[in-house]
Amino acid sequence: MPDIDKAVAKFNLNEYYDQALNLIVSGRARNAFDLKQEKDKTRDLYGRNTFGQSCLLARRLVEAGTRVVEVVWPKVANSDNHSWVVHQGLEARMKNQSAPMLDQGLSGLLTDMDQRGLLDDTLIVWGGEFG
């Protein structure tokens, strides 16, 4: 019996596999990806940029029943996504780009989840490459 099969048998992971598959095929998670279903006011709360809309998507996935959601902030070429890694022009980029995006996206997520009663059962962790 391969190691993964032993782990499944030992920890009864089949139930988790079934839940994950059901989440995907049921359409709940798939529908969560359609941000156009949100009101403009809600989308604006998070910020109309890659990070802000990713935070909104995270909230929608939690509402859809997703148990673990991760929002990453990579550098994306030719986009509004300025990334958190700044090696040149630190002061200007942090003040004018990265910090405002973070502030609006994360505070929008916390505000929206609180208004919907989702913070009672949700752990949100924010961290950077140095903690």
Where are these regions (language model features)?
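Ligand-binding pockets and gating/stacking loops
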Residues: 1-131
